[in-house]
Each structure stands twice: as C-alpha cells, then as structure tokens.
Amino acid sequence: MLGNVKKTLFGVLCLGTLCLRGLMAEPDAKELVNLGIESAKKQDFAQAKTHFEKACELKNGFGCVFLGAFYEEGKGVGKDLKKAIQFYTKGCELNDGYGCNLLGNLYYNGQGVSKDAKKASQYYSKACDLNHAEGCMVLGSLHHYGVGTPKDLRKALDLYEKACDLKDSPGCINAGYIYSVTKNFKEAIVRYSKACELKDGRGCYNLGVMQYNAQGTAKDEKQAVENFKKGCKSSVKEACDALKELKIEL
C-alpha cells in the first residue's frame, strides 16, 4: 500500500513539474537585454553577447546597440567596426536613439566608414528626434559652427535647449553661452544653474562668474565663491584659479 502512495506522490510531482515547465515562458526581448547587462557586469561577455543577439533578433533596438558596442570595443568578440556599424544601424532603424547617436559619432570621426559630417548630422538629428540628449547637443554644435549643415545660431540654441531639458549639462552650458554673448544674462543664469545642479563644474564656474560680476543678478560674492569651489572640486582649472585670485582656500 505504501508503494502505491509513493507512486501516486511521484506522479503528482511529475505532473507539477510538467505544468511548471509549461508555465515558464522564454524571456522576452527586454528581459534578455537586462540579462545581458547583468552578464556584462560580471565580465561574462560571451553570455552577454548571446543575450543581446537574441534580443536583437526579437527586434529590440537596445539589444542591437549593445551588440554593436561589443564589436566596436572588442568585448567577447574580435573588434570589428563593420559589424558594429551593422548593429548600430539596425538599432537606429528600430528607433533606438543611442544607436543613431553612435552611428553619428562613427561617421563624424570617420571610424569604420568614410568621414561624412553631413551623414553624421542626419543620424544625430534622428537621435535627437528620439529624445537622445547627446544627439541634440552634438547636432546643436554642428549648427552652431556650420559643420555638415548650414550655420544657424537660432537652430543651435533650440537644440541646446532641448538637450538641457533632457538633462544634458553640456547642452545647458552651450545654451547659457549663447545667451551670455547675446547679453541675455538672466536666461544664461538659468541654464548655468541647471548645469551646476547636474553636477557639471563648468556650469558652476560660469554661474559664479555671473554672480561675481553682477550679470543678470545682484552681485553676490559669497555665492560666487561657493560656486567656484564646486567648480574647482570638479577639476575646473578656471574655478581653482578664481579662488587663488581671491585668496580663498578650497
């Protein structure tokens, strides 16, 4: 009788396992990307590559971009810029802003492809449309200096503003700079303040200069010094020099 009980229990357990297997779904594309990131953190690049490949096959743009980065940097695979470009392109086509931005970098610098500032600007433009902050900032710089696209200060400012809104501190600083040279000091202060809040020492230094010189605000030497200190702690040489000139120790 005991033998029959054991057989019954075993049968139930087997049935439970079969049911469990049936309920356990394969990881979806997003989960595969997360698994890939975890494997990469553990320096298991071969396993990470496998996860990213599967995610990319499932049309996850971020997975394709990670795979491209592995080929660009030679992690878990031989370094291969052509393959990197192939996967960045697929990521960009799948509307991943990082992929578009990285493609822009490669075309701008002529890495793995012929140098082409115009094509780079097109990829940066798509990256920006997809709300990739760095893409907006770099595209703004291209318009600012007329590289690969007509020079357009108004367009540059709009792009810097968008980058700043997306919490890109260089975008805030560049927007602040344009406002400064056009004597719109109050707007410059707003942008430099945001850059400083984003822990960018250059923004803190620029804000301090405006506070010290009473540009767009009442003169405030005490607050200026505090911002020079923040800048100096972030290794901004000009901020450290300002403190030395004022004979103030960090």
Curated annotation (Swiss-Prot):
The keyword Secreted applies. SMART domains: SEL1, TPR. It catalyses: a beta-lactam + H2O = a substituted beta-amino acid. Transmembrane segments: none annotated. Its EC number is 3.5.2.6. Gene3D superfamilies: Tetratricopeptide repeat domain. Inhibited by cloxacillin and oxacillin but not by ACA derivatives or metal chelators. Antibodies against HcpA are present in sera from human patients infected by Helicobacter pylori. This is Beta-lactamase HcpA.
